[in-house]
């Protein structure tokens, strides 16, 4: 194949929502700033309105949505070589989503992505493109085929990032006898799984290509893809972290934390339309503990990687009824209640997201997909009272077909300490990292929220969904919400500002991002903008205070669930590593698909209030804000 093609190109595809690692965890403890290895956003995004004006593109038509998408890529990038990624699907709105990866000399350009959205009419609806358009090598420069090269790349990654893996005895084994570009690195210690190395191209921030080894290492707090220069393994061009960290909230669904309600016994809470085997089966086995098709929950006091044999409650007759009070101490005395709460919240959210469109085809987390598309064997590993850290939580999202991993820690900012499993918003926030990473760029690509701005939006989507599900019947647009207030023992929460539609209470606007360089801060701006959109839709359509949406012709009948649905659909439409403007446009297009555009003005007004109006411009250093809305929205105000 392409041997140790240590030639001139490197690629780094953004995979998973990369959240800022708090200063007490993972590589940050070792003085490594992973944010310094991020790539810039580079995707172009053509929305439906632009596609309609391009007669050549709008004329493309076929009953086969993959064929139409392929023809589009050939038209837009006639000189490029590429391959079809095997995660295309038709979503519940009838839109087909197709994903392509650029190749050069037979080697993937890891951040060369092209996503195409095909409407129900068999025509192109919108598309995103981050293909490399500059010079490409005529052939890969080969070096002596030395099988130690992947090992040298591993050593380079370990040294540059201070990754605590011992690799003195590491040896490279090809994953396929005919493939000399993809290796498993045996003989290491300190990782949760054997590291791997794959030869890929990467587009660097200066637009040039570099040939790199994509070295994958999982040490728990950080699950990294490190792009090591193939010719000089002391150079690292880009780092992707599958683990998204955060800080945040549960009891009955909708109760944010123990201050809002009491424990109560709930019977058979699952929905058989979304969890057809209930929460305790997988189609072949019925379990009497917290194991099922959607997840596996257990305690993990040591913080280790093993979980299958960890402790789980196993009550008689599936009666998971355990006492808990925030005054109980130490946390280990209520571990049964903690696991049960985490299990309930994660499964409930799985079912809600399924109703909103995050199903097997689009890459959700299930062991048995029951012939509904996508790749199975990717339940969520749910670790309660995880001993690998404190005052945090995180979620790791590998591509479809590999389990997600949620780790929930004890928080020590109150006395007695507080268990984050009882704060619903934290569970939702973390799980939403899995949602946003699987939908953006396609289920097979968890690297599409890896740039600084897109990674920040990853935090924002997580905060948005966590806030939306906690709304109360008496809430209005004047209701403010903090994030993580209970677990942090701080009424202001863990964000700079509470979420509010009041510009004095929360003054964040689009151009605020010009002065920010940390993903949670950027995410707070994005979630603030979405909070405005949420209330505009609620004011128009009302608010369903029930735990599940009601639909009419596939459209949620109320504003809260409609907002969640449009944001979710926008994730599937937007390009890999989007910026604020592109993500805004994807939500607007999602409304055109779902409702025929009946909510365009409500959306525009929400965006424009926070400077993301029609005149907003994106530049990584000088974003330009705009409070303008389309003329029709001004006429009918």
Curated annotation (Swiss-Prot):
Keywords, ordered alphabetically: Glycoprotein, Hydrolase, Metal-binding, Metalloprotease, Protease, Secreted, Signal, Zinc, Zymogen
Source organism superkingdom: Eukaryota
InterPro entries from the UniProt entry: FTP_domain, Fungal_virulence_M36, Peptidase_M36, Peptidase_M4/M1_CTD_sf
Subcellular location: Secreted
CDD domains attached to this UniProt entry: M36 (cd09596)
Cofactor binding note: Binds 1 zinc ion per subunit.
Cellular component terms (Gene Ontology): extracellular region
Glycan attachment points: 282, 502
Signal peptide (residue range): 1-19
Propiece span(s): 20-245
PANTHER family in the cross-refs: EXTRACELLULAR METALLOPROTEINASE MEP
Protein name: Extracellular metalloproteinase 10
Lineage: Eukaryota, Fungi, Dikarya, Ascomycota, Pezizomycotina
